[in-house]
């Protein structure tokens, strides 16, 4: 039920994102969509660690984009159109009603048979075990994880060296 609602909210924010013009509104919409995706990822796994790390990475990227956008479009007015608000609220209401209808029909169809219920329970058990975070740090994938950590560290060092205060692209204008 919650996953269907999150799917509908993700689709709604995607449609809103396509209709935005202002860069700060685009960033805010992207941040809200990131929160929804992280909540959905956390609900699909056993723990919220993966979604928390994903959110922090996205938030760091959004902060860098926010710095660039505020230096480019600092004096633009941010106004919200009534047409876009009405359109997005209608889409959201439609998606939520559709998710409620789909949830009731799918649960009544699946609960009619005990065999189907046992298959659903078995499927959820396998999904929980397959999406566990233990696989991320065990033998076959630990090399990829260490490589990704080293790549992020080197990228951080390079970005710090590139964006020195008086020599980088984010320098003070006097």
From Swiss-Prot:
Superkingdom of the source? Eukaryota
Look up and give the organism this protein is from: Drosophila melanogaster
Q: Which family does it belong to?
A: Belongs to the complex I subunit 6 family.
Gene behind this protein: mt:ND6
The protein's predominant localisation is mitochondrion
Q: What is its EC number?
A: 7.1.1.2
GO molecular function terms attached to this record: NADH dehydrogenase (ubiquinone) activity
Q: What is the lineage of its organism?
A: Eukaryota, Metazoa, Ecdysozoa, Arthropoda, Hexapoda
Q: How does it sit in the membrane?
A: Multi-pass membrane protein
**What name does the UniProt record give this protein?**
NADH-ubiquinone oxidoreductase chain 6
Reply yes or no: does the keyword Membrane apply.
yes
Instruction: Give GO cellular component annotations, separated by semicolons.
Output: mitochondrial inner membrane; mitochondrion; respiratory chain complex I
The record lists the catalysed reaction(s) as: a ubiquinone + NADH + 5 H(+)(in) = a ubiquinol + NAD(+) + 4 H(+)(out)
BP GO terms, sorted:
mitochondrial electron transport, NADH to ubiquinone
Compartments annotated for it: namely:
Mitochondrion membrane
Q: Which UniProt keywords apply?
A: Electron transport, Membrane, Mitochondrion, NAD, Respiratory chain, Translocase, Transmembrane, Transmembrane helix, Transport, Ubiquinone
Q: Where are the transmembrane segments?
A: 24-44, 53-73, 82-102, 143-163
Q: What does this gene product do?
A: Core subunit of the mitochondrial membrane respiratory chain NADH dehydrogenase (Complex I) that is believed to belong to the minimal assembly required for catalysis. Complex I functions in the transfer of electrons from NADH to the respiratory chain. The immediate electron acceptor for the enzyme is believed to be ubiquinone.
């Amino acid at each position: 039920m919650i996953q269907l609602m999150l799917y509908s909210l993700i689709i709604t924010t995607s449609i809103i994102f396509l209709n935005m013009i202002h860069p700060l509104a685009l960033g805010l919409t992207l941040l809200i969509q990131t929160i929804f995706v992280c909540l959905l990822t956390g609900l699909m796994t056993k723990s919220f660690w993966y979604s928390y790390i994903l959110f922090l990475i996205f938030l760091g990227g959004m902060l860098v984009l926010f710095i660039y956008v505020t230096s480019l479009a600092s004096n633009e007015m941010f106004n919200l159109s009534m047409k876009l608000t009405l359109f997005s609220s209608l889409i959201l209401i439609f998606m939520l009603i559709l998710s409620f209808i789909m949830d009731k029909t799918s649960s009544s169809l699946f609960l009619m048979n005990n065999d189907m219920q046992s298959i659903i329970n078995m499927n959820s058990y396998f999904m929980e075990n397959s999406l566990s975070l233990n696989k991320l740090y065990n033998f076959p994938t630990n090399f990829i994880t260490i490589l990704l950590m080293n790549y992020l560290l080197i990228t951080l060092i390079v970005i710090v060296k590139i964006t020195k205060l008086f020599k980088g692209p984010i320098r003070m204008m006097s």
